[in-house]
Amino acid sequence: LFLLKRGMIKIKKKDIIKVGSFFSGIGSPEKALQKLANENLIDGYELQFFSEINRNSIKSYCAIHNVDEALNLGDITKIKGTDLKYCDLWIGGFPCQDISCAGNMQGFDLKSNTRSSLGWEMIRLLKEIENKPKYVIFENVASITSKKFKNTLDLFKEDLKNLGYELYDDILNAADYGIPQTRKRYFLIAILNGCDSFSFPNPILTDIKIKEFLDKNISEKYYLSSDICEFNDGKIWLANKNTNKLVYEVDVEKYKKGGLCGKDHSIKFVQSTRIYSENGFAPTLTHSNLANNCKLAINVDQTMKIRKITPNEAWKLMGFDTVDYDNASKVCKETALYEQAGNSIVVNVIYYILKELLTK
């Protein structure tokens, strides 16, 4: 180690990174750090603590990363900064429900008591500790940068600057980093005292499609039954959950440019009414009813069928592998596994961010 200005200590590229994880979910940053270590880009990482309140997520996290539940500090509002071990890196993807376009849009103002306002708890903890982490990464939905939330985000960033952090932020799409999912997320990188410069990773150009992430030998329970949907002479049958199996036949030829289709355009178009090609990208996977919100048109023995994605496929579309899923599936049911995928950060995206941050 060697000293920099203001007495700060710079991390050598091969030091073991001490990590604190907030709003941990199933730990995609930890998965990304392990991948960097496996590639000998860092010596490894040491988890000092994680903070998660969802019981199922805690079980999956411990199963995936092989850590003791005693490392979980639980509710972030009950954590005292003075009790935290030193970390080189903090990471937190704080709740998006009050910021997301799919949520109630109540915002994340300080002391507003919305779930999304819990992001301010990380700043509170930064104010309470003397030996601050060199790096802090925040993640949330892209709409946090919208006009509606601009003032709050500016105040959030101003507090970080006042604590001595230099800031970098951008919106990255998982589809640009080797995952066939359209998922745009906002990342805010804070570097203490500007010891390092940082640039967000360039997109990784690939032709990867959903079909490369699909499981083999799928159970029939994931397929929509023929009384709900069928393909017939260039037309597709679409079902809406509120129609009690009543379906509408729509001439696909009229919609060659893509987009949505329905009876006289009178259906309220929501994600659950859409069918996606296996030769394209998945939509943004969310924790809410994920299985029904991502239906695929699959060629099975020269016959087109429609099915839900499996929870294992959902995990793969978030950058986790089947070993991770298998470990989590031993402690959680499918419903929880779908939710955990939808709430996660995409491993590939945070991997490339951490690679730029820690190895350049």
Language model segments and positions:
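Conserved S-adenosyl-L-methionine
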Residues: 73-74, 142, 164-176
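Alpha/beta-hydrolase-fold catalytic nucleophile elbow
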Residues: 93, 139, 189
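Short beta-strands and strand-loop turn motifs
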Residues: 135-141, 331
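A short, glycine/Asx- and small/polar-enriched loop/turn
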Residues: 86, 180-185
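S-adenosyl-L-methionine-dependent DNA methyltransferase catalytic core
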Residues: 2-47, 67, 105, 155, ...
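Short, conserved secondary-structure transition motifs
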Residues: 57, 175-179
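Core alpha/beta nucleotide-donor-binding catalytic domains of modification enzymes
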Residues: 9-133, 142-154, 161
